[in-house]
Amino acid sequence: MTKQAFNYFLLHAGSLLIFSSLLVSCHTKTLDSKTKQVFRYNEHKNIGSLDPAFAKDNADIWAVNQLFNGLVQMDSLMNVTPAIAQFWTISEDAKVYTFSLRKDVNFHSHPLFGDHQTRRVTAHDFVYSFDRLKNPQLASPGSWVLQNVETYKAIDQHTFQINLKTPFPAFLGLLTMKYCSVVPKEIVTHYGTDFRSNPIGTGPYKFKRWEENIKLIFRKNERYFETNSKGGF
């Protein structure tokens, strides 16, 4: 990894740590009513995109982190923990990473998914998402994250494998970056560049409305796969 890329990774990790702390500290400021809870967050900088492939600064990262998930994530102690991948193995030569995916992760509702309005995330979705991230035509600022990746493939519906060019101990840390979030092909294909303002992901919140430079509204994702002891998140 280049020095510039490593510095960016540290910025990303630090941003997620700060935002995690913000969510905890602001929890007591949540407004309760008989029907809903409202969390208000003020961002001093305008959000540029809700497409994870363009989550390059703090404002974008915070918003995208509420909407999308990747294979792994970083906790408040900067440890890599499971996300959509429930566990993984690393080969003896430290070049092959095999991820076993959860079977209870669904995309946010959208009519394009058909009668059920949603569908389950599979390993093939990660193949598409990585292909998209690497595509020069997309010109994602995060394409460098996969520069040491030789190949990747879906072994089956719930197994995703990545082969590195050379061993890199911090690779799992790179995968926690929001650039590596899973996105649904049918939605991205439908919206094209407008996916930036019509995001469909798997995160704890789902997109409702965005008045750029004014306000951004999310709704709770009732189907979110990560829950606490009380069934919430």
Residue map of PLM features:
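Bacterial N-terminal signal peptides that target proteins for export
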Residues: 2-13
